[in-house]
């Protein structure tokens, strides 16, 4: 959630096994959104990694497939928001780490106590490319959008899943 000055991470979820995009969307809705009284219509932005779904033999990104699955789940032709990729250029991981660190110190980032993987990642990740980086990246893509001085200034910016 975003209050205009602070970002609240209310839930985390990682698929226990491979799932279709439709299964992911249904599970996200059931386990992450509805318990907080939220639905896809209240989502303003979505960020997803810039991977492709070539494993299925079609020229489409996973973000596009998630967008279609959200629209289908809601019985609409278009989703109320679009999953877009985050910026992953040189120095972007380090920049997100600085943004998140500053926000924590300034009281602009709050993480619900149920988000144990993210809390563990924030406490112990030291910059390596390991399992601790995945929760950091996922939360960082959205945190960057809301907490970065660049994006808050109204400058055009693209983020990744």
Where do the model's predicted regions map?
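Mg2+-dependent endonuclease catalytic cores in nucleic-acid-processing enzymes, primarily RNase H-like
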Residues: 3-130, 149-150, 156-161
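Generic structural signal for bulky hydrophobic/aromatic residues embedded
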Residues: 125, 141-142
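Histidine-centered active-site/metal-ligand motif
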Residues: 134
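Short, hydrophobic alpha-helical segments
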Residues: 142-150
